[in-house]
Amino acid sequence: MSRRHAAEKREITPDAKFHDYVVAKFMNCLMLDGKKSAAEAIVYGALDKIQAKTGQDPLKVFHEALDNVKPALEVRSRRVGGATYQVPVEVRSDRRQALAIRWLIDYSRKRSETTMIDRLSGELLDAANNRGAAVKKREDTHRMAEANKAFSHYRW
């Protein structure tokens, strides 16, 4: 990692259908091997499926799912005098969003439905209703931070 200057953030363009930056970021994270059109088809297909199932605005459900998965605290390893402590720290807002997106994608890929559209829509619906593997991951992260609260004075 270079110590000269931090890498500058790239501007991302909002997605074509919803004109939403977060949906565009989600697509970029879902994309494999530069196949953006495939990622778009999966995300839009999943959001259409959510609308068909619930009758609600799919963008609202998507943002609700993302908010339910965003972690507030996480633990970072800190070495103090030969011992390594798991120190709970607050998560920055940009990292919070990145972790939520990553967890939603990872756990939707691990689901058992046949198509990625079904898996992603299922995980988004579960997350919007505060259940599912991605929400469990957030709860586990918070539980780890709570268990190591005694070491919070080692914060940096």
From Swiss-Prot:
- Listed GO biological process terms: translation
Q: Which UniProt keywords apply?
A: Ribonucleoprotein, Ribosomal protein, RNA-binding, rRNA-binding, tRNA-binding
Q: Which GO terms describe its molecular function?
A: rRNA binding; structural constituent of ribosome; tRNA binding
SUPFAM superfamilies noted in UniProt: Ribosomal protein S7 (SSF47973)
Q: Which first-to-last residue range defines the signal peptide?
A: none
Gene Ontology CC entries for this record: small ribosomal subunit
**Subunit-structure text:** Part of the 30S ribosomal subunit. Contacts proteins S9 and S11.
Of which family is this protein a member? Answer: Belongs to the universal ribosomal protein uS7 family.
Reported function: One of the primary rRNA binding proteins, it binds directly to 16S rRNA where it nucleates assembly of the head domain of the 30S subunit. Is located at the subunit interface close to the decoding center, probably blocks exit of the E-site tRNA.
Protein's name according to its UniProt entry: Small ribosomal subunit protein uS7
- Protein species of origin: Paramagnetospirillum magneticum (strain ATCC 700264 / AMB-1) (Magnetospirillum magneticum)
Q: What is the lineage of its organism?
A: Bacteria, Pseudomonadati, Pseudomonadota, Alphaproteobacteria, Rhodospirillales
